[in-house]
Amino acid sequence: MIEGSFMLNSTRRQFIQTGMAGGITLATAAQPVWSANANNEVNVGFIGCGGRGNILMSAFSKVSGVTIGGVCDPDAERLEQAKERFPKAQAWTDLRDLIEDKSIDAVVIATCNHWHCLAAIWAMEAGKDVYVEKPLSHSQWEGEQTVAAAEKYKRICQLGTQQRSDPMQAEIKTFLHKEKGLGDIVSVQVNRVGVRSSIGKRSTPLLIPNDMDYDLWLGPAIDEPIFRDKLQYDWHWDWNTGSGEMGNWGIHILDDVRNVVFRDAVKVPTRIQSIGGRVVWDDAGNTPNVQMVAMDTGSVPVQLQLANIAAEPGGKKSPKHRGPGSGYIVQCSGGHYEGRRGSGVAFDRNGKEIRSFKGDSGNGSHQQNFIDAVRKRDQNILNADIVVGNDSTAWCNLANSAFRASREYDPNLVTHGLPSMNEQAERLGKILSPHGLGLQSKGIQAS
């Protein structure tokens, strides 16, 4: 039992009301500190046993000295599957029970986005170290509270942006900055171009399975009817529980850009504009499936294009784009570099390949890095410390905020906006055109 804990004495509604009132005062709690035992073992508990949770269970189980000591999920079917994989692990439906258990040294959080911060704060309050999946926060306020909790309770806290642990990243930074292999950096283009499908639009609310503890699944989210076809995974495309493609894939690429191009010197953009919408599909989602973003960083400008619709109606191919579908292009005075998860290629001015980079995407090594920090009690060796993770997540939250604050498309917003907005609008127009849509079509918004 954690005396005085906000965790133990709050309901979903109370958490929402407290947050809206201006902030949560982090309670002082007993802080058991992990210490080396004879076998240097770390007992890890998992909150969230779905797709990503299962991948992380596999990764952590391969780290020497790590025991999968607990699994937790409000979905009974997923929990049972996790128990079958790790029969020696304790199993809970309520994350608070896992967090309270004194045998658990560290917690891995792979829930829906809206649970990330609250679960992390509760775990750190209980003296656990935390590995939390990306994006860190569902809102920037939550992220700041999580950073504060890590500092207050002296916890090791790592964000699941595993590409930070890919050795390739250091090689690329040396090539671009120290060696000046392509000259001066001029601009950056970020791409997330990948076809997805409609999530459906029911005429009646989705029935929640009887074996799901829906109140625990909702947590701090608003209890409202769901009209999509599936409860799981497609929560990404609902602002109530997800962060859209920007928080799903965009966080990985933008984190790479912050790391490789800016070397974390730029915390957040100074100005940001967005144009896009949710078009083509008449479904229950409310996050954009096409979005162009311009970011003023105070130095190197960043453009981002996001497209989940196909190149043409009924097609399966993505719209045409320069560079990787999920990656980024660093335009330089002497050529350009194209980076993606696990690999990268540098080209000269004439488009000739002059150097390639090969990595491991950080899978496995990122989890090892977290455990190393837990054992050494040294957050400085983390490759994706919670402060860095909060800053990278902020880029996604700001891009989403720019979209949500936007209004019906007005050419003046583009004409008098950031320099790259005209190019971004033209790019969006080309993606929309095969579907019989344009910038003036219903659903297209600009900020």
Predicted feature locations:
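Basic phosphate/pyrophosphate-binding loop/patch that engages nucleotide-derived ligands
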Residues: 149-155, 171-186, 199, 205-208
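C-terminal helical cap and adjacent loop that interface with cofactors, partners, or active-site loops
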Residues: 18-23, 55, 228, 245-261, ...
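Rossmann-like dinucleotide-binding domain that binds NAD(P)(H)
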Residues: 215-301, 307-315, 387-391
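N-terminal secretory signal peptides and thylakoid transit peptides that target proteins
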Residues: 2-23
